[in-house]
Amino acid sequence: MILPECRLPAGKYRGVLGAVCGQGIKAEQEIRVDEDCLIELPAELLTRVYRELPGDKLVRTAELSLKNGDDFYRCRITLYDPKQKAVPATGTVYSQNGSAGFLVNGKPVGTHSGSLGFWEGRIAGESASRFGGIGIDGSVFLLNAYEFMDSNGQLNRERLQSALNQRMAQITARNPNVYFKIYFHLYMPPAWCKKHPEELIKLDNGTDSLEMAPGKIRQPSYASELWRKQMGTVLRQAIQVFRESPFADRIPYLRLCYANCGEWNHWGYHEHAFVDYSLPMQRAFGKWLKKKYGTEEALRKAWGRDDADFNPDNLVPSRADRLKGGDFLRLGGTETQNSVDYYAFFQEFAAETILYFAKIAKEASGRRLAVGAYYGYYFGHYGSNPYHFQDSGNYGVGKLLHSADIDFIGGPAQYHNRRLQLELNGITGSVNLHGKIWESEGDQRTHLSGEKNKSLGTTDNLSESIAIAKRDFMLNLQRKSSYYFYDFVFDWYRDPEFMTAVGRLREIDSALRSIRRKDHAETAFLFSEETIPYLTSRGSGLLREFVKNQIAELPRLGLPVDYYLMSDLDRIDFSRYKVVLFVNAYYADNEMIRKVQKYAAKKGRTLIFLHAPGVVGDSNRLDPEQSARLTGIRLAVNPDASAAGIRAAWGQMKSAAYRFRTEISDPSVKIIAYHDNGTPAGAERQFSDHKSIVICHPLPNAVFLRGLLAREKIRWLASGKSGLDQVNFAGPLISVYSRSGGAKTLWLTEPAEIVADLFTGEILGKNLKTVNFQMPPRPETRILYAGSAAEYEVFRTANGKD
C-alpha cells in the first residue's frame, strides 16, 4: 500500500499495527518504506490483527504507526476478509415509552441520527471522527447515480462499487462505528436527457434549463414512464451493489431524492415558471381525471368546457388559468375547477412517485432498508406564491403515511429568522401516528458558518451557537423527531465546546429514552391538506399574515401543542385534549364534517375554528351553509372586504390588512371578539357535548391565542412576563430559549420533587410547582428537569454513548 500524506525518508521502521487509540491488539513488525512511500504488510499480520480488532462489522479499522529515531508516521487503514460476506444491515423505526427513533440492527440510534459524511465529492473525515467520539455514528452519504450511468441509462455497477468502497473506507477509518445513510439521487445523466426531450418536464415560459439540475439540463417529468422504468432498474441494481459490498452491514438507510436539491420540491420556481406541460404529465393528469369524473360529459360540466376530454395535450392548466380566482381562495366554480383538480392531482401524484421508488427499494433490500424522502414541508412552502406553494407537490403526506414502504419523511426547518425562533417543517404528530418518524435536516449555522450564511442563521459567537443547538434539540424531542447535522462539509461544528455541548445533549436524550415519558399537551392543532388546491396561486396578503404568525408566534405559546393533519381525524386520541384548534379548515365535505362530529366534538371538548372554516367544498364556490354545518355558527363572508386587527376581552392584536373578511352573522351565539370596525369577529356556541368557537382571523398572534386558550382552561406553563420565549416540552424536560433574558416563571403541571438545570447542575428547587429563575441578557437556552429525585439521577449520570 502507498502511505497517504507520507514524508518519511526511505528506510526500515518499527511498525505497530493495532486497534485505534491503542485499545486492544498491538502487533509489531519491521516495515520497509521505499522512496515512493510504498510498504508491504504480511498477510498473516493483517489476518491476525483483523481477527482481534473490536467490532462485529466486516470492515474494521486499524491504526498503523511507523517510527525510526525522530521520524514518526501514523495513519488508519481499513481491513476486511474477502472470504466473508457482510450481512446486510436492517433499519427500522420504533416507538417505545413515549419516545421514537430509528433502530439500526435492532439498536436504538437516538434523536441525533447522524452528520454529513460525503457531499459533492468531499469527505468529512474529521467531522465524522468528532461526531463518532460522542456516539453519533450515522454518516449522511450523497450518491448521484447518474455519475455512474451512461447515456442509455445503464448503470456501471463496477464503477459504483469501487467509488463506494473507496469513499466509505475513508469515513470508516475516521469512525470505526460508522453506518451510512444513503441519499440516492434519481436524476438521469444529462446525455440521457438530451436523447429523450419528450420525457422531460416542460416549463410554461419556454425556459430550456433548470438551475438546480445536473448540468442545468431539464430532467424527466415525474410522469415519464421511461424514467420510472430505467431509474427503477438502476435503483434495484444499486441496492444489490450495496448488499454485495463489504460495507453492506453498515447501510441500513436509504433516502430517495429528486427535483430541486433532491427535496421533491418540484422544478420551476428558480425559473419563474409553472410546470409541468410535458406530454407524460398531461396523460397522467388525464388518467386521474377519468378516475374522478368517469365520463367526459361529467368533466365538461365540471370545467365548463365543451371541448374537454381525457386525452388531449392541453389538460394541465395554463398560467392564466392558475392565476384566476380570488385573492385567497380560488372559488369561481367551473372557471377555476381545472386548477383545483390539477393541484389536487399533483399532490397525490408527487407522493405516488415517491412511493413507486420506495416500493422498489423495499423489495430490492428484502425490506431491510429504512426508506424515506425529503417531503412534507407543510410550513416551508405554505403561501409561497407563485411557483412554490401547491406547485411543490409537498401536500400529499396523508397518502404517503398510509404506505408500508415509507419509514420516514422530513427536511430542514424554515430559514426565516431562525435565530429568533424555530419550528419543524412538517405535521409531526400525524407522522408519528402512522408509525413513521419525521427526520429533520439540522443545517444549523454556527459562529463558524461565515457572513454569507448570516441570513440563514450564522450566530455571533460560540455561546449563541450552543444556545440554538440546545433549543433545536429540545424542539425535536418535543416533536418526537430525529435529526442529523448537515454542514455542507464546511465543518461548522468543529468547535470543541460546541461538540461537548452536543455530547451532553446525547446524554440527556439517552436518559429520556430510558424512562417512560409522559407528555402534557392539552391542545391539538389540526392542519388541512385538502384545503391546499383551493387556495390561490397568487401572492396573498392573507397567506402572508398566516405564514408570519406561524413562524414568529406559534413557537412562543409557552405551552405544549401537538400538530396533526385533518385526514387523521379518525386516528387521533382526542381523549388527551381539552381543545382542538382547526387552523385552516377552509375546505370541508360531508365526510369531514361527520368525522369532526364523531371523533372531536365530544366529552365537553372545545373546538376552535379560524377565519373561514368550511366555506368551500367540492362545488368550488362559497358555501356558508356548509360552514355552519361544520361549526354550528353562521358566518358572513365578503371576499372583497378587508380586515386587520381583532380585539377581545382577553386581548387585542393588530395585523396588516388582508382581503377576505369573515364576520359572525348568527344572532343566536355569544359574541366574544370584534374586528377593528366593531363587527363581530368571534363567537361561541355551547352544545350538549362540546363547545364551538369561531375566530375570524387566519392565525392570531401568541398573546391572543394564549388568552383564548386560557379562557378554555388551558394552562400556560411559561409566564412570558419578561417576553414570550420559545419554550419546549418533552416529558419531564422543559427548555426556555431567551434572547434577552430576565426573570422567568414556569408553572408545572404537577409538583416536582426536584427541578434542576441539566447543563449546569444547579438545583432550582425541591417539592415545588412554580419555578422562578433568571436568564442572562443574551441568547441562552436552559434545559430543566422537573420530576422525581430518582429519575433525576438517571439524567445526572447518563452516558450518551450507551
Predicted regions and their residues:
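Short glycine/proline/serine/threonine-rich loop/turn segments at secondary-structure transition edges
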Residues: 47-61
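N-terminal carbohydrate-binding accessory modules
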Residues: 73-132, 514
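The substrate-binding groove and active-site-proximal loops of carbohydrate-active enzymes
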Residues: 108-119, 142-161, 213-233, 334-352, ...
